[in-house]
Structures are given as structure tokens and as C-alpha cells.
Amino acid sequence: MTEMKILIVTLTYIEKSIIDEIVNNLSSYGLEVDILFDSRKYLPISAFNWERLQYDAEKVLSFLKSKYDFNYDSIIFLADSDGYIDGYNFVFGLTIDNFAIIFLNRLREEFYNRKPDLELFMKRVVKEVTHEAGHILGLGHCNTIGCVMNFSNTVEDVDKKQARFCKNCIYKIENLSKYLQRK
């Protein structure tokens, strides 16, 4: 589909099975994926909103962009935190330019006072990482039922979609890739 090198940076412990699923899913689209386990990095306290008890996603991403300078087309961060942007109660993830962050807290069943479910958590993480990778590839939100690029307002919305791009989104990615190769 497109030749792109993506670095996934885990800012928290993530089960290897989840990382493997992320790599397999993104690799199936021809993306080259590397993993960096970097629990030494922290989210900046200056980005934490004490009234909301959440991180300002834009401030966090700006901070992380300044700390990582690798030879990758894109970097996606995974943080075991809760994030928001102005105008929204929360976000599962945010992409700015070629950088994205996924906030994992609300993808866990425990957040909703339910029994932990590692398999369901893994599916949700893979979907949200793929969704943010889609934004990095130039896609907006999609209205095709089940497409990973559907906007998710709730965790139930995440559960309804697949971890795959629909045919229309794949077509858009392929055409954008061809256009960029001609430039």
C-alpha cells in the first residue's frame, strides 16, 4: 500500500501479545513497524489538568514530539493515561502531523468498573492504533459502517468497528501514496 516506517513507543508496560497484534495489523498494510519500550519517559505534569484529572492531549503530544528525534516517518505513543482535547470530555487518541498518542485508560474494562478482559482490551488498542495510523496516512473519519476510521465517541463505538480499513479508505491511501511518489 505505502512504504512508511512507523515507530510505536510504549510509555507503559503493554503485554507482548498486544504489541504483536499491532505490528501484524499495521504490517498487513505494508507499513514497517518498530517498537520502543520506553517506560522511562513520562507525561509532562504541565499538561495535566487537575480539575479534570486528565492530560491535555495536544500539550502531551507537543512535549513528546520534542523528545523523540528518530529516523521514522511517524511515531505513535501508547500511554496508560486519560486524555482530552478542548471541546471533548475525552479522546482515545490524537494525531498531529506524523505523531499520534493513544490513551489506554478508557480502553480497559476496569475503567468502567467491569471485570478485566485482556482480549477485548487488545482488540480496542489495535483498532485505535490503526485508526490513528489512518490519520497519519491522510485519512479523515469515515462513515462506512465498521471501518476502523469511524469516529468513536464511546468505547462501545470502538467495539462496533473492525480493525481494518474499508475499501474506500484503502483506495484513498493507495491514491495518496501514488501522488506522493510522483512528487
From Swiss-Prot:
The active site is at 132 (proton acceptor). Zn(2+) 1 binds at residues 131, 135, 141. One of its GO terms (biological process) is proteolysis. Zn(2+) 2 binds at residues 142, 147, 166, 169. One of its GO terms (molecular function) is zinc ion binding. InterPro entries: MetalloPept_cat_dom_sf, Pept_M54_archaemetzincn, Pept_M54_archaemetzncn_arc/bac. Its EC number is 3.4.-.-. Monomer. Belongs to the peptidase M54 family. NCBIfam families: archmetzin (NF033823). Probable zinc metalloprotease whose natural substrate is unknown. This is Archaemetzincin. It comes from Saccharolobus islandicus (strain Y.N.15.51 / Yellowstone #2). The lineage of its organism: Archaea, Thermoproteota, Thermoprotei, Sulfolobales, Sulfolobaceae. The gene is amzA.
